[in-house]
Amino acid sequence: MTFRLRLRFVWQTWRMNDVTRYPAINAVLTEWADGVKRMLGKKIVGLYLSGSLAYGDFVPERSDIDLQAVTRGALTEDELRSVEQLHRQMERRCPQWADRIECSYVPLELMRELTPPATSRPWWGFGTFYAEAPAGNEWIINHYLLSKHGIALEGPDFNELIPPIDIHAVRQASARDLFQEWVPKIEDRAWLANSHYQSYLVLNLCRILHTVIQGQPSSKKVAGQWAKATYPQWRNLIEEAEQWTYGSEMKRQADAAAFLRFAVERVNETELL
């Protein structure tokens, strides 16, 4: 029994050290997975890596680390405090990833919901822990992408936890996300003045357009390449958004807002909603 446990520990350690081609990120993933398992034990159903690290187009200078934990039941107040403390310790020890780790903790019973559940779930992002974060249109989009590209760090394949997702529903969710999440940003001058947000907006608009028009949810890299070829008038703006890194400036506020209006026109033409 002790020998089998030792083999399992060695195999898991080797696997975590080989999840991505970035040793520093593998160390972060190991610390998170070990910490969550230590705190929650058998309450953990699965731990998953998603986002650009799973798609294969991660850019260290600007990309985030996207994680999801699936739990048996909701977390208690003590567990919530422990999870928050874990994330704060991780970002203090790895300051290069401060404000660049996003992680949700979803009870297993909510995973069967195709539409955003009314019940909120804990979420860590931008250096802040939200014990009750509501799910939005990103719910079905993220689950679809996890079903196609997600990497299980612990537990079963992600597809075993969710019902099949229809691509039409993903296209509709992406269109709704455009109008509910992004269109209001046109009037938010302070938000648009932020270089990071300008880049983030432009690249997300490329993904929305690619998903809605092509019916193919994809990475920002793939969507950006498609958008530059399909809408060459926006090539320069998209390339600048792709090249942006933390610490650099992107002074394209007016152009980003114009691209947002352009995206609205293209999505409206589909009559998807």
Predicted features and spans:
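Glycine- and acidic
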Residues: 14-19, 69, 242-248
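Extended, basic/helix-rich recognition subdomains
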Residues: 180-240
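Structured mid-to-C-terminal alpha-helical surface segments
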Residues: 216-273
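Catalytic metal-binding acidic patch
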Residues: 49-51, 55-87, 100-107
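Helical scaffold of the NTase/Pol beta-like nucleotidyltransferase catalytic core
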Residues: 7-48, 78-80, 273
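Conserved NTP/Mg2+-binding pocket subregion across the NTase superfamily
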Residues: 7, 17-18, 85-195, 202, ...
